[in-house]
Amino acid sequence: MSRIGKKPVDLPAGVSASVSGQTIEIKGPKGTRAFKATDDVTLTVEDNVVTVTPRGKSKRARQQWGMSRTMVANLVTGVSEGFKKELEIQGVGYRAAMTGNTLKLNLGLSHDVDYTPPAGVTVTAPKQTEIVVEGIDEQLVGQVAANIRQWRKPEPYKGKGIRYKGEFVFRKEGKKK
C-alpha cells in the first residue's frame, strides 16, 4: 500500500479539476496545468477532492499510484500558490541585474552572462546578490534555478558562487605552509 497514494488531494477555494480519460486538468488563479497519468491508475474528482487509485496489484501500478498522486498535488500547489526558488550570490564583484526580461550576471568571467528564462517562469533580482525564480511548474522552476546556478557553483575554499538560499557549502582548509 502506498502511504502517499492513499491520501486524497484537497482542492482549495478557487481551484477546479476536470478529468477526461487519463488526463487531469487543474485550473486556478495562477493558471492552468494538465497531467496525463499512465493506464496503471484511475483519477477521480468528487466534492473538491482528487483521489488516485491503482488499477491492479502489480509493482508498476503501486509505483505509479504514489507518483501520480504527488504530481496532482504539485499541480494544485502550482496553480494556487506557485513555486519559488531563491538563489544567493557570494563573491567580490559578483552581481545580478534584470535588463528587461533578461537576467544579466557578472560572475568574474571575461564576459557578462545573459540568461533569458523560458515562458512560464519569472526571474527577478530584488538585490544585486539575490535572484528569485517563480512559476507554476515545479520542475521548470527548479531547472531554471539549476541552470542559473550552473554558471558559477559555490566553491569549497572561499565559498564564492551562486547557491540556493540556505544551502550549506562544505568549506575546505587551504594549503598549509
From Swiss-Prot:
A molecular function (GO) term: structural constituent of ribosome
Top-level taxon of the source organism: Bacteria
A Pfam family that the UniProt record links to this protein: Ribosomal_L6
Keyword rRNA-binding included in the entry's annotation: yes
GO cellular component: cytosolic large ribosomal subunit
Gene3D superfamilies documented for this protein: Ribosomal protein L6, alpha-beta domain
Record-level GO BP terms: cytoplasmic translation
Alphabetically ordered keywords of this record: Ribonucleoprotein, Ribosomal protein, RNA-binding, rRNA-binding
InterPro entries, alphabetized: Ribosomal_uL6-like, Ribosomal_uL6-like_a/b-dom_sf, Ribosomal_uL6_a/b-dom, Ribosomal_uL6_bac-type, Ribosomal_uL6_CS
HAMAP family membership: Ribosomal_uL6_B
Self-association and partners: Part of the 50S ribosomal subunit.
Role played: This protein binds to the 23S rRNA, and is important in its secondary structure. It is located near the subunit interface in the base of the L7/L12 stalk, and near the tRNA binding site of the peptidyltransferase center.
NCBIfam families referenced in this protein's UniProt entry, alphabetically: L6_bact
Family: Belongs to the universal ribosomal protein uL6 family.
Protein name from the UniProt record: Large ribosomal subunit protein uL6
Name of the gene: rplF
